Amino acid sequence: MNIKIIGVGKLKEKYFKAGIAEYAKRLGRYCKFEIVEVPDEKAPESLSQAEMDEVMAKEGERILDKIKDREYVYALAIKGKERSSEEFAKEINKLTTYGHSDITFVIGGSLGLSPAVLKRADAQISFGRFTLPHQLMRLVLSEQIYRAFTIINGLPYHK
């Protein structure tokens, strides 16, 4: 089983790196876990809608270049479906049961994900209507993936 998170931008904060490294270590018992960073598109603070669309399209191309045809792709999107930890674990377990051994999660940059990435996604997932920094989302997602595996394996981590 291979789990990959594709994130836009470079993770600079040591505390996020440390947290993700801890969950990556824990996940090593259950899967090959990988985080792939794609460069964010440099843009001024104030953008027109056309400029925003162009930034998202360029970042989207970089994301799509990192996704293989066989991968089951979750796009993290505000309009995605919210799931409980138990529902998420059940879904991951079902995917692996039905032969999806490569699961990829995509976290967009500050403007979100391009329509092309959303179209490629097999499912959209939301962690609520909060706006969170995409760097923090990598840590939260890593923890939820670990939690899903502990639920699947009946371990006491999830209470």
From Swiss-Prot:
UniProt KW keywords: Cytoplasm, Methyltransferase, rRNA processing, S-adenosyl-L-methionine, Transferase
Location in or out of the cell: Cytoplasm
Keyword Methyltransferase (UniProt): yes
Top-level taxon: Bacteria
EC number in record: 2.1.1.177
GO CC annotation, single: cytoplasm
GO MF annotation list: rRNA (pseudouridine-N3-)-methyltransferase activity
Broadest EC class assigned to this enzyme: transferase
Enzymatic reactions: pseudouridine(1915) in 23S rRNA + S-adenosyl-L-methionine = N(3)-methylpseudouridine(1915) in 23S rRNA + S-adenosyl-L-homocysteine + H(+)
Residue numbers binding S-adenosyl-L-methionine: L76, G108
InterPro entries the record matches: Alpha/beta_knot_MTases, RlmH-like, tRNA_m1G_MTases_N
The family this protein is said to belong to: Belongs to the RNA methyltransferase RlmH family.
Known function: Specifically methylates the pseudouridine at position 1915 (m3Psi1915) in 23S rRNA.
Subunit structure: Homodimer.
Protein name: Ribosomal RNA large subunit methyltransferase H
Organism of provenance: Limosilactobacillus reuteri (strain DSM 20016)
